[in-house]
UniProtKB/Swiss-Prot annotation:
Serine protease inhibitor which exhibits anti-trypsin activity. In the pancreas, protects against trypsin-catalyzed premature activation of zymogens. In the male reproductive tract, binds to sperm heads where it modulates sperm capacitance by inhibiting calcium uptake and nitrogen oxide (NO) production. Keywords: Disulfide bond, Protease inhibitor, Secreted, Serine protease inhibitor, Signal. The keyword Magnesium does not apply. The record marks R41, D42 as: Reactive bond for trypsin. This is Serine protease inhibitor Kazal-type 1-like. Residues 1-23 form the signal peptide. Residues 26-79 form the Kazal-like domain.
């Protein structure tokens, strides 16, 4: 009986510790306007957290809105 109680308490403690983990957020959030009609044709490449190079930050925002994704800017420049 004592062994079962100790086992149960240990299992609960491990489950509690496992539930407290948080996901690490990678990259910088893109500066996206609330209304996005179109994007300028300026070439100022950004590397998304999906490993794809976008022509500019606006294009990344447009793709996020179009496909319902939340790709962030990993860095400025080509991937």
């Amino acid at each position: 009986m004592k062994v079962a109680i100790i086992f149960l308490l240990s299992a609960l403690a491990l489950l509690n510790l496992a539930g407290n983990t948080t996901a690490k957020v990678i990259g910088k959030k893109a500066n996206c306007p609330n209304t996005l009609v179109g994007c300028p044709r300026d070439y100022d490449p950004v590397c998304g957290t999906d490993g794809k190079t976008y022509a500019n930050e606006c294009i990344l925002c447009f793709e996020n809105r179009k496909f319902g994704t939340s790709i962030r800017i990993q860095r400025r420049g080509l991937c």
